[in-house]
Every structure is written in structure tokens, then in C-alpha cells.
């Protein structure tokens, strides 16, 4: 098992956010590095080809088989209170993707389809607080690491 470094990921997100010009795509290299650290045998693709329900930001592959997708939103966007087009997209992805992670870099929601094919949030964790100027919640780092390994 390789080492996931959530602290390094958070520090990178915080540093980019501090520029006050970073947006959603600016955080993707750090997210890709974090996802690749889960297991060296996995392939992580940023901006994969479109699938039936849309174009999630990342696909995680084992060989040529997709094992999960990740949708990354901008830091500060509340992924648990989506509205409008973001809410519609989230529902499409939850309905169409059996193993999905939604994140804004700080909040992480993990969805899996149950035996009936219905999307269920199986876990959520927050590794930082946006309202307090991007303060880390280091006690949650191990929980995120465990969820990513799973």
C-alpha cells in the first residue's frame, strides 16, 4: 500500500487558494497526485471522455476497467447544498455512476450504488474549513485516507 499524503494535498490547496485567483481547475493537479497515491497500479485520468451521464473530472482505472469517478468542484462551493445546474449534474452522476466521489478539496462525499442500483452516500468527511480562511481539520486526515484506500 502506498502512502496517501492528505496534509501535502491540503497545503497545496491552501497555497493556491491564498493567491485569490485560483479556481476549480487550479486544484486538479494536487487532486490527481492524491488520487494516484492510493495505489500505483491504478491509472487516474483527468478529463476522461464523456460517459452516458456526463463528463466527470476524473476516472480511476484498474487496467482498462473504470473503478470510480471523481467530480471536483471549486473550493468554497458547498457540495452538500448544490443548486441549479450543479445539483442536476450531481444527481445525474449519482444515478449513473456506481462508485463516485464528490469533493471541493475540503469536503468529500463518497457514493456507491446499493444492491438495487440506488445511489447512497456511504461516507463523508471534511478535512478543512472554508469560512475560517482554509483551516485544516487534521484529525480528519486519517479518515479521508482510509476512505480513499477503500
Task: Give the positions of each predicted feature.
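A short, conserved, highly charged catalytic patch centered on acidic carboxylates
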Residues: 1-99, 107-149
